[in-house]
Amino acid sequence: MSRPIFEEPPDDMPDRAGALIINWAGEAGMSAPEVRDAFQTAAERLVDAAIGRREHWEALYPILFCYRHALEVALKAALPATTHGHSLPDLWDNLRPGLIGRVPPDQITWLGDRIAEFVHVDPRSTAFRYHDAVPSGRDTELWVDFHHVKATMARLLLVLAQIARDQR
């Protein structure tokens, strides 16, 4: 097992199933929308697998981490490239003023409410990554309906993608 995990691309790469190439070529690698889509796709596939295998609790943290990260990247994609950090409230606070007058008020409220839900359960972007990062004061039990979270996140990320496209 001494073979490296990250290798030069093989000549027969198109024939290998599941192969991935990371091609930075001196650039960032993937655009923010591509990263957002990759994490959304990963979350959706995990949701589908969890539902199909009835492995709900085992898949919960990876699913929510992927969705939370897709949300963060979606917010960043709609903001100037100089905006950094992992704080959803800060990212939302930077984006929201520019939406007023361009996006229906009820949609702005809906976006803010969904973002606030993630902030409530994962204020430091760590709750779904580490076993010991549960924020104090969090509800002891919360229910996540996988069908609902998949549909809601698809809508949320679509709206943010449209906002990002309109910003350009």
Functional labels for PLM-detected ranges:
Residues 1-168:
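Domain-scale activation on soluble regions of proteins
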